[in-house]
């Protein structure tokens, strides 16, 4: 489900406004949750061709049909779109209100696509209903010595991270005890 999209704004002696950033972030986020990369689709189609078990084939067929319907109807492939993670490469360009533009693009996508509002305040547990909040989305900014601004959006799904386990190993269990726990 991981899809990374980016947009580059090259320096052409203009101000990259908050509104430009908002609109591009909206477009990127929308595409990221609706359109799956051709390489992933091809991998699923290849898996379907070589799969021998009927139940597994049915599941792969259902996934491929879901991908097709999402693109046709313009709706997210999965109801769990997770957390939008934003990566920015900021070069020698003039940018207006970068964080605000990103947050407004995420909010617009949440309301218009629509995307399920997943984000809650870490202390109150109150849902923001717009997928933005204090330090959300996380934005990683890398300063570069180039003449462009690049924005990449990665919808980080919450599903796979729900499965975890912890064990306090006894010293007598040694490495074998650790291996046994990890392999289980």
Residue ranges and their predicted role:
Residues 1-14:
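Short, Lys/Arg-enriched N-terminal segments with co-localized hydrophobic residues
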Residues 14-184:
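Non-transmembrane, aqueous-exposed alpha-helical and coiled segments at domain scale
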């Amino acid at each position: 489900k991981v899809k990374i999209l980016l947009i580059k704004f090259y320096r052409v002696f203009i101000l990259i406004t908050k509104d430009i950033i908002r609109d591009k972030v909206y477009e990127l986020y929308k595409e990221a949750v609706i359109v799956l990369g051709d390489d992933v689709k091809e991998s699923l189609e290849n898996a379907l061709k070589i799969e021998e078990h009927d139940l597994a084939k049915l599941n792969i067929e259902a996934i491929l049909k879901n991908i097709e319907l999402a693109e046709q109807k313009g709706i997210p492939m999965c109801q769990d779109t997770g957390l939008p993670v934003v990566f920015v490469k900021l070069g020698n360009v003039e940018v207006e209100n970068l964080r605000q533009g990103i947050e407004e693009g995420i909010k617009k996508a949440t309301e218009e696509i629509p995307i399920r509002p997943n984000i809650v305040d870490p202390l109150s547990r109150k849902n923001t209903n717009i997928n933005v909040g204090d330090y959300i989305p996380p934005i990683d900014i890398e300063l570069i010595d180039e003449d462009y601004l690049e924005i990449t959006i990665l919808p980080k799904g919450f599903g796979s991270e729900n499965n975890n386990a912890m064990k306090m190993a006894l010293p007598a269990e040694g490495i074998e005890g650790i291996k046994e726990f990890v392999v289980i």
